[in-house]
């Protein structure tokens, strides 16, 4: 479960992290009232569960009351990557030039089968950009989930990352952040920027906090944070179906497979083919025709999807059940986008016979996933994909 910035700050504050105060508003008039209360320049920040809010115009500095009101009117109700902004966080503006911005974060790192603490002196930037252009500027440190991050480890990481200021206070914030991540079963926690003021005091100006959905039964006190209206509607619908589904930004090829490993590999081959996957969708093992039908229906609803790549290796999943689900979606007029399939394994021959008998121009099968990915990418790009 993703938390809004203000919610993530509330969780971190409970663990003793020094976070920037702010107030939530749902109307321009409320923003105006908050500005009057603060009596100084503010920043109006869209609260949506996607990255790139600033680039999309969802974060605005407001030097005066009129500007705060204008920015609130522009941001509230705007669409950011398919999500409508229904609320904003209003914070006091900080003079960034009077201090230094850093980045710290904790992720579940499957490569080391543990948590990894990340720190960088390149704060205020998207960490993905830093990882792509200057990966050496990100310091990584494995955190033992039993002992947690110890103060001396945090200080060592801060020094290696080139942090300046009161290193004991910075290390203390990192320790408290890691404790929040561990105790709240987070898969991701970020403080970006971690602002160190002229006195060397660290302040969390912006945060990301995401809790493992499978652990939410342990955190029922946070269940009220979930807002279906703030989540992507396709992800909400997928949850109703019981699918493992993630909407991906800027994609043009819908991806459907059986098993997380196959789906992850499929994302890679789509990228290699010159397109971008629009989603992650795992139908699971043993999926029947109705499950496949619902999965195809879900992916077809995404306007970003220009072509669909179905990658199936049948074990307990029968390929003919997959074919029946696809054919049903076609017969009902739900499937209107090109489908490129690689289908193999249990009942492969039966599946191919069903699809060949249907003889639809929309559906084509290929012997390898690389060929299918290349054809799906060609179709998507030719049809105006991103």
UniProtKB/Swiss-Prot annotation:
Keywords: ATP-binding, Ligase, Magnesium, Metal-binding, Nucleotide-binding, Tricarboxylic acid cycle. Heterotetramer of two alpha and two beta subunits. Succinyl-CoA synthetase functions in the citric acid cycle (TCA), coupling the hydrolysis of succinyl-CoA to the synthesis of either ATP or GTP and thus represents the only step of substrate-level phosphorylation in the TCA. The beta subunit provides nucleotide specificity of the enzyme and binds the substrate succinate, while the binding sites for coenzyme A and phosphate are found in the alpha subunit. Its cofactor is Mg(2+). It is an enzyme of class 6 (ligase). Substrate binds at residues 258, 315-317. It catalyses: succinate + ATP + CoA = succinyl-CoA + ADP + phosphate; GTP + succinate + CoA = succinyl-CoA + GDP + phosphate. Mg(2+) binds at residues 192, 206. One of its GO terms (molecular function) is ATP binding. Gene3D superfamilies: ATP-grasp fold, A domain, ATP-grasp fold, B domain, Succinyl-CoA synthetase domains. It comes from Deinococcus radiodurans (strain ATCC 13939 / DSM 20539 / JCM 16871 / CCUG 27074 / LMG 4051 / NBRC 15346 / NCIMB 9279 / VKM B-1422 / R1). The gene is sucC. Binds 1 Mg(2+) ion per subunit. This is Succinate--CoA ligase [ADP-forming] subunit beta. Residues 9-237 form the ATP-grasp domain. ATP binds at residues 45, 52-54, 94, 101. Belongs to the succinate/malate CoA ligase beta subunit family. PANTHER family: SUCCINATE--COA LIGASE [GDP-FORMING] SUBUNIT BETA, MITOCHONDRIAL (PTHR11815:SF10), SUCCINYL-COA SYNTHETASE BETA CHAIN (PTHR11815). The keyword Magnesium applies. The keyword Metal-binding applies.
